[in-house]
């Protein structure tokens, strides 16, 4: 039923409106399940099935980011700007998600399906100066909260890359 393209809250503030996003996501899941079981013409496959589990809290692609001594930007990635403090390499395209136009026709402003725009880049070393806070002493970041712009987050937010950032921060904290 669901897949990676199911995401809600693209038009809402990820921090201030989190409960609204969560509630709408649950509404989407249960409404689609009800449709498949009760109204879908070919519902024989769904009629006797049960919904086994639904995550109460969905994964956030983007939320708060802390400010480091450097903010990694799209220009850095596209122009392959050299930083002497380069660390873990990005391993993915710049992957940006937008509401799916077809879904927007039926649910304007409340889309729950997305499309991804991929911008090819070369693997890029994330500057160490993006992995620590510039104004909170001894605070490291290694994940979706690092010091990057929205577009740069599109390549740094992947699990393989965040895991490598964790290794870097673990060594730095020693």
Regions inferred by a protein language model and the residue ranges of each:
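Flavin (FAD/FMN)-binding glycine-rich loop and adjacent Rossmann-like elements that form
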Residues: 1-174
